[in-house]
């Protein structure tokens, strides 16, 4: 079933993915939220440490977008959006930082902006 999205200020009013992506913000200036977010399956949690960042992103995106985007297309969008490193750097024991500035513009927004652009292009 395709995902529907609602405004945080008008929870009873739903739009489809296309409208949510192309409008960006609802007319009431809320934020679009998915109606449902399915939990990640047990096999994901059993194997997540062995997955790449794009693989993790794809698994999460499937739970959010459901059938709104064909799975093969969604996988392509995610892999094209996160095709640069995001190293987890250890600062000291039990203290780490995820560096999100290794993309084309050297800013954390590269992940989201690239994903949004590819989703809009789809």
Which residue ranges define each predicted feature?
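PLP-dependent amino-acid enzyme catalytic core
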Residues: 1-122
């Amino acid at each position: 079933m395709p995902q529907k999205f609602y405004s945080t200020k008008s929870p009873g009013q739903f739009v489809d993915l296309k409208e949510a992506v192309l409008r960006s913000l609802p007319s009431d200036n809320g934020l679009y939220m998915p109606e449902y977010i399915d939990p990640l399956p047990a096999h994901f949690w059993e194997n997540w440490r062995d997955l790449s960042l794009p693989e993790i992103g794809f698994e999460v995106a499937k739970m959010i977008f459901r059938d709104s985007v064909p799975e093969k297309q969604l996988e392509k969008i995610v892999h094209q959006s996160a095709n640069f490193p995001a190293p987890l750097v250890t600062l000291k024991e039990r203290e780490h930082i995820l560096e999100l500035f290794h993309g084309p513009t050297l800013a954390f927004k590269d992940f989201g902006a690239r994903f949004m652009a590819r989703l809009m292009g789809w």
